[in-house]
C-alpha cells in the first residue's frame, strides 16, 4: 500500500470566515495557521498547498492576556543603520489592527515559497464588512 500524496490540481480550497472578537491572539493564530497549511485535512501533503482560505473579521477586537497590551513589543527595521523602530500592542492595534494577527500567523508558517503563497490566503479586516461574499465563506467556530 502506498502513501497518497496530494497533487496541486486535485486539491480543493474552501473559504471560511472567523470572527476574532474577544478571541485570544495566540490561540486564534495557531488554529488559523494550521488551517491555512491544510493540516486539518487527511490529504495534507507538506510540499503541496492543501490549505483553505480564511477571512477574519473584527481583527481590531482581538484580545491578549496579562499585561501584554503594554509590554508586547513589535519591531521593524528600515534597512538603514540605526533604523530600528519599536511599537507596542496598543499602538499597533490602534493604527494597523490587521497587522497584529498577520505577524502572529506569519511567524507560525514555513519560510519559503510555499509559506509565502500560504499567507496570501489569509484575508484580514478590522470591521465586520468584507468583500468576499461571492465566495460564500462558511462560518468557522474557533
Swiss-Prot record:
Annotated InterPro entries: Ribosomal_uL13, Ribosomal_uL13_bac-type, Ribosomal_uL13_sf
GO cellular component terms listed in the entry, alphabetical order: cytosolic large ribosomal subunit
BP term (GO), one: negative regulation of translation
Keywords (A to Z) from UniProt: Ribonucleoprotein, Ribosomal protein
GO MF entries: mRNA binding; structural constituent of ribosome
Subunit relationships: Part of the 50S ribosomal subunit.
PANTHER family, per the entry: LARGE RIBOSOMAL SUBUNIT PROTEIN UL13M (PTHR11545:SF2), RIBOSOMAL PROTEIN L13 (PTHR11545)
Similarity remark: Belongs to the universal ribosomal protein uL13 family.
Record-given protein name: Large ribosomal subunit protein uL13
Amino acid at each position: 500500500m502506498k502513501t497518497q500524496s496530494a497533487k496541486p490540481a486535485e486539491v480543493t480550497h474552501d473559504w471560511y470566515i472567523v470572527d476574532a472578537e474577544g478571541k485570544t491572539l495566540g490561540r486564534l493564530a495557531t488554529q488559523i495557521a494550521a488551517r491555512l497549511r491544510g493540516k486539518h485535512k487527511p490529504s495534507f501533503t507538506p510540499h503541496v498547498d492543501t490549505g483553505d482560505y480564511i477571512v477574519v473579521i473584527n481583527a481590531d477586537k482581538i484580545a491578549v492576556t496579562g499585561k501584554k497590551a503594554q509590554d508586547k513589543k513589535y519591531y521593524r527595521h528600515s534597512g538603514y543603520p540605526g533604523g530600528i523602530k519599536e511599537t507596542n500592542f496598543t499602538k499597533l492595534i490602534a493604527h494597523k489592527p490587521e497587522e497584529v494577527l498577520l505577524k502572529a500567523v506569519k511567524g507560525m508558517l514555513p519560510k519559503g515559497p510555499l509559506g509565502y503563497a500560504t499567507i496570501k490566503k489569509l484575508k484580514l479586516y478590522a470591521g465586520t464588512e468584507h468583500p468576499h461574499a461571492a465566495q460564500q465563506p462558511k462560518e468557522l467556530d474557533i
